[in-house]
Amino acid sequence: MDSTNVTTDPNLRPRRGGLQRRFAIIEPALQPDTVTDKIGKDGRVVSLKSNYANFNIKVEGPFYMYDVVMENKSIRTKLELLLAYANSKNNGQPFCFDGRRLFTTSKWHSDEDTENLVIKDVEISIRLLTTFLKNSEEYYQMINIVFNNIQIFMGQEKIGRQFFLGSNCESGGIREGPSFFKMDNFKILGGYSTTITRGTNENGTASTLLYLERINRVLNENNVVSVYRRDQIDQLIGRDIITKYNNKTYRISDIKEMDVNDEVQLGDKKISYLNYFKQRYNINLKNDKQPFVISRVKRSMVRPKEKTENEPEGPTETDQSLSIPGELCYLCGFSDSERSNINLQKNLGTVLKREPRERLNDIRDFCKWTGAGKSKDYMKSWGMCIEEQPITIRGRELAPVDIFSNEVKINTKIPDDWKFGEIKFDVPKGTAHRFGVLVVDRNPSHFNNFIEDVKREIGRLRINYTMDSISSCRSNEVEDALTDFIRVSKVHMALVFIPDDKVYAKVKNFTMSTGLLTQCVTQRNGSNRDDRRRKTVADKSVMQMFSKLGYDPWGINLKMAPTMIVGLDTFHSKTGKRSVQASVFSISAKFSQYISFVNSSKGKNEFHENLGKNFLTALTTFQNKFNTMPLRLIIYRDGVGDSQLAFTKKFETDAVMKMIEKIYENQTLPQIIYVVVKKRISVKFFKDGANPNPGTVVDEKIVKPNFYEFYLVSQKTTKGTASPTNYNVLMDTKFTNKKTNEVSVMSPSVLQQITYSLTHLYFNWMGTIRVPVPTHYAHRLAELVGKIHRGVTPPAINDRIRERLFYL
């Protein structure tokens, strides 16, 4: 199957500036060749609403796209100038503009492709790039820009990639529109995210939908100068800042103390920062010497052919460093301490966490706010009409999954929550476990109550244990103290009371290197005087401790032919250093225990090479345990953005297939199902004005016609609005039944039920999670290693714990 579905008009001849052949469907075709049925059948049918709307534009085309050059002005000013020209010369013919590209419904040029205009004494040069028709790639770009222009006419400003109320606005200047909230040093700017997307009609053809969501941007009124401390630079690196003079956002890569009189190369001349900001933005810098924010902005480039002979072509990136005076850089979002401030988050949560009924009104409110003033006239010129009600979708609620602990069902009250059930570990009789206790920088007596809570819970579970080795040490002696546990006490696991994240990193690094399992508890939780809260933490710690030792607190009945389930994820450092890839492979019939690997690769070739080695080791382990190779591999891949889907489909799935063919040489190949998991989506579903129930699946209407995808809500949400997870199947080879020799693909219903069942097996939470557990374990492992080693090549996982969930 081609990577893209193409529809062309045979009457159109390609020429510069003329009508050209264009793709009618711009997304790549990711649906596997073997799949014909993409809609599941199991479950109870329910009616849902979603944050999409139908809309109509009467303008038919043809359309013209120009490149526009004018003196440096804000996009709002440029748009106003072009509007004045359209009203005076073209009788108000519709157009849209994104700051550089101009789209029109009539010719703005004469016989030459380039036209020079003068509008209100401003010289403007426009150059024709192409003309196009409806349902082309440019058409959808144009409609997205139309909606961006509508928001500009509503009085919003572009911050980053979205449109919000202006960063300099105050409560008294807010016109009717998105919400504005201010408290202490924080501003919350409201806005809308609008995108034209493709859906699927009942007959399988493509439809066009308007995705719409209310969004917020959190701004901190503190600039970098006011919060800068030399010994706390690490707390600022990785955070986002906004520069209010141009409403652009940047990420802090580094901070350096500089002088505003230092010079920077600007074209063919040098200019001081002081003079640059005075001449360009009329800003007088106040502090001569101050911290400068260093932001490394990545620019995409095309790799030279000579560098891509042995790997697929794709974009690479080069770094361009920007230095910005700290007094002009205002922080966005929250610091770690602000994020953990319960009172602050509670107050701001009234704006940030919106309930389902509020979100259902977003489309109606958007229509109301755009139906006045300049935005109304602008929409009228395009003949645009938006349905004020969100679309209705058919969903299905999958059957609840039974949870068993020691062969007893424990989710009898609430299917997706079994915290009231009694957990029992199936520990063989006579097995004894030795635990050591280490207290860092504190007196061990402060944690006696917590230790007794732990002992009481282990005793309740009727597990043999000893916990006699209790030690204390300073922060710089942690490794030595843990080494004594291995050499002298010979413990199976250490319970460590940690004062901060730095000690936590030391402990987990020691675990990976030596294989000593550890359970970390913050000293705040360990010394809590509230008996109930302290006991809750102790009980949860015990559950994690024995899960790390290889015992299952609960399980599910998921009967399949010998199957291995794989989780893949990548951690990207905020500082732009090397990424960390984690892969986990199931090695138990209940899909509860995994063998884990972590790698730091320089490029895609090295990534595939490491992944091949991991697959070989995992499959060999599986064969040794079950005396057979897996007949089916289900791979859940996280960490793939929308722009990487086509690349992943074309190259990564092909690389996986070649690995498996090599490993299974002279054997029947297993069925391979490769699924991309995407959590960071803004699609919402609503049932009767509230959140949908866990187990709700949507695989119609809003899914793309050239994708094999579905949405699954697996968690119950009591505050705010539930977020589904998107699953995109890139590969689904055929399964061969050895008994009957029948060949078939996995039905959508079965894959959806397996995916939902796997969200019940995270042994750190007695309930469902948003993604299948191997995906989450890979995420936990990649994040743990990435944060500990900060871009440095991580050590290999010690063989003693490779088959343990040490990262719980």
From Swiss-Prot:
Residues 214-333 form the PAZ domain. Coiled coil: none annotated. Residues 492-790 form the Piwi domain. The keyword Zinc-finger does not apply. It holds the Pfam family PAZ. GO terms for molecular function: RNA binding. Residues 300-322 are annotated as: Disordered. GO terms for biological process: regulatory ncRNA-mediated gene silencing. The keyword GTP-binding does not apply. Expressed in dividing adult somatic stem cells (neoblasts). It comes from the Eukaryota. SMART domains: PAZ, Piwi. Keywords: RNA-mediated gene silencing. Belongs to the argonaute family. Piwi subfamily. This is Piwi-like protein 1.
